[in-house]
């Protein structure tokens, strides 16, 4: 479904998932929700929040967008302590099993969510998580406002999250 697919068997490593917490990149839009047992924590595209104390010991999946292959992906992988360019295996990150998924930069659901004609990494990750887990998805740090990045169509993305899933806590 997304470029270098992970195997479905890797996702079976995450058992007893009762909800998914997807972390975006807006620290001012914070629910301060502490991950509880059964929460699968997913950080997408940006690695800054992997060092925020609230999540320091609990990032299970880092989803990267393939379009940033040289400019962003390698430094991001290095920053969170994962081996450079090895994107389909599991690693130990702060005593947690961390799988890194390399996502293709085009969405196969025909949703053109960014002004550049590409789906955002967040929405790709959202669809991917929905495909494998039938649990509520909480978005942390996604405001739905458009000031942060001019290439994102934030209102379209905001609407799509609600249209395609059981989403709560978008501030």
Predicted regions and their residues:
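Metal-ion/cofactor- or nucleotide/acyl-coenzyme-handling active-site neighborhoods
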Residues: 1-171
């Amino acid at each position: 479904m997304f470029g270098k697919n992970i195997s479905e068997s890797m996702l079976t490593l995450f058992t007893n998932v009762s909800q998914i917490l997807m972390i975006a990149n807006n620290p001012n839009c914070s629910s301060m929700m502490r991950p509880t047992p059964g929460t699968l924590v997913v950080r997408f595209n940006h690695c800054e929040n992997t060092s925020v104390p609230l999540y320091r010991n609990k990032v299970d999946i880092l989803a990267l967008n393939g379009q940033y292959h040289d400019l962003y992906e390698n430094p991001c992988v290095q920053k969170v302590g994962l081996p450079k360019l090895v994107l389909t295996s599991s690693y130990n990150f702060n005593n947690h099993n961390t799988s890194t998924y390399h996502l293709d930069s085009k969405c196969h659901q025909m949703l053109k969510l960014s002004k550049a004609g590409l789906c955002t990494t967040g929405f790709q990750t959202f669809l991917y998580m929905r495909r494998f887990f039938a649990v509520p998805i909480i978005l942390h740090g996604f405001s739905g406002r458009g000031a942060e990045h001019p290439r994102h169509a934030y209102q379209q993305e905001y609407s799509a999250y609600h249209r395609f899933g059981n989403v709560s806590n978008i501030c």
